[in-house]
Amino acid sequence: MSKIVKVIGREIIDSRGNPTVEAEVHLEGGFVGLAAAPSGASTGSREALELRDGDKSRFLGKGVLKAVAAVNGPIAQAVIGKDAKDQANIDKIMIDLDGTENKSQFGANAILAVSLAAAKAAAASKGMPLYEHIAELNGTPGKFSMPLPMMNIINGGEHADNNVDIQEFMIQPVGAKTLKEAVRIGSEVFHHLAKVLKAKGLNTAVGDEGGYAPNLGSNAEALAVIAEAVKAAGYELGKDITLAMDCAASEFYKDGKYVLAGEGNKAFTSEEFTHFLEDLTKQYPIVSIEDGLDESDWAGFKYQTEVLGDKIQLVGDDLFVTNTKILKEGIEKGVANSILIKFNQIGSLTETLAAIKMAKDAGYTAVISHRSGETEDATIADLAVGTAAGQIKTGSMSRSDRVAKYNQLIRIEEALGDRAPFNGLKEVKGQ
C-alpha cells in the first residue's frame, strides 16, 4: 500500500505575485508529491471556490492561510493512512469532509493541491511518470497522444491592460509533425510578431499569459498582425498555422448586450455577436472559438452552435467550468461542442477526469488549460498526454510559468516516441 504518512500545505507565490496553495504529500518508502493550485482572472460564476483570507493587511486580502490551514489540519488528518494510489477515494474523502457544493469550506485551491500532490506521490511509488499513472486512473492505460497547442500570442481582455476586448488570440501550428516542432514554429511566429508590432510602433510588453498586449485599432487588427507575422516567419496561414480565439465574452456582457470598446463601444445582441464572429471566421482560418457568449446566455449559445458548430470548434469554459452536471446539460441541449478543462474550476483530479470522459463520450473535444495565474507546476502537460485529450492551452512563448508546460511536453514526447502520436488539426472539432 502507498500509505500517506504526512501532508504539508504552504503559501507560495503565483505568476501574478499573488499567493496560492502548494501541497506536499509524503508516502511510506519516502515517495513525495508536490503540487500547486493555479488561479484565474476571468472566472466563471459557477467555479468551485478559491478560498482567500480577505485580510487586507496581508497580500491585499489575497492570502491563502485559511486554505493552507485546511491542508495542514482537517485534510491531513483525514487522508493520512490512506492509499494514495486510490485517487478516487482520496478525493472523495476531501470533498465529503468539505461538505459544500462548491468546496467553499476548505477551498478548491486546498483540495486540488492535495489531490494533485497525492497523484504525483502515487506515480513515484509505482515507479512511473505522472502521465502514465494518469492514463491508468483514466482507465486508458498505455494510451497517449501529444496535444496540439493553442498558443496565446496576443493577450487582451482581463489578461492585459490594453483596449483589445477579445481575451486571447492564439495560433495552432497544425503543419507540425511533432509537439517539439509545433513549439519551434510557435516560437518563430512569436518573435516575428514582435518585429511586426515594433515596425508599427506598437507595444511589445507581454500580458499574464506571455502574449503581447498592444493597443490596436480593432479586434480584427489582432488577427491581421498575426497573419503578417505568420507570413514573415515563412509559414502559410490556414495550412501550417490555424487560428483560435477566446472571447471570454462574459467580461464585456452588459445589460444583455455585448459591448466592444475596441469597436467604438458598439453593442451587439447574441445573434449579432455570433455573426460578428462568423464574419471573422470567413476572413481568417479560425478553427476554434472559446466562450463566444456570456456563460448565462444559453439560448444565444444554442444559436451560435447552430450557426457555427458544424464548421468550427466551440469551446465552453466559463460556460461549463469543468463541471459534469453543467456539461451534461450542455450536451443534452446541443450547446457548444467542446469543453475547456481547468483543474481548479472543479477542484480535484477525479472530477477533472470525469469531465474529460463525459465530453469524449458525447463526441465533444476536451482542451486542457492553464489559468492566467500559474506556477512552475506542469501537471497539465501530463494530464493532456495521459488522457490523450488532444489539445492544450498553456500560453505563449514567454514567461517561465507558461514555458514550463511546453518543456515538460517536449520531455514527455522524447520519452514516449511513437507511443504518443501528434495528430495536429485532426484533434480539433469540425476539422
Swiss-Prot record:
Pfam families: Enolase_C, Enolase_N. GO terms for molecular function: magnesium ion binding; phosphopyruvate hydratase activity. It is an enzyme of class 4 (lyase). Mg(2+) binds at D246, E290, D317. (2R)-2-phosphoglycerate binds at Q167, K342, R371, S372, K393. It catalyses: (2R)-2-phosphoglycerate = phosphoenolpyruvate + H2O. The keyword Secreted applies. Binds a second Mg(2+) ion via substrate during catalysis. Its EC number is 4.2.1.11. The active site is at E209, K342. Pathway: Carbohydrate degradation; glycolysis; pyruvate from D-glyceraldehyde 3-phosphate: step 4/5. Its main location: cytoplasm. Its cofactor is Mg(2+). GO terms for cellular component: cell surface; extracellular region; phosphopyruvate hydratase complex. Keywords: Cytoplasm, Glycolysis, Lyase, Magnesium, Metal-binding, Secreted. CDD domains: enolase. It is found in: Cytoplasm; Secreted; Cell surface. One of its GO terms (biological process) is glycolytic process. Disulfide bonds: none annotated. Catalyzes the reversible conversion of 2-phosphoglycerate (2-PG) into phosphoenolpyruvate (PEP). It is essential for the degradation of carbohydrates via glycolysis. Belongs to the enolase family. PANTHER family: ENOLASE (PTHR11902:SF1). Component of the RNA degradosome, a multiprotein complex involved in RNA processing and mRNA degradation. This is Enolase. The lineage of its organism: Bacteria, Pseudomonadati, Pseudomonadota, Gammaproteobacteria, Enterobacterales. The gene is eno.
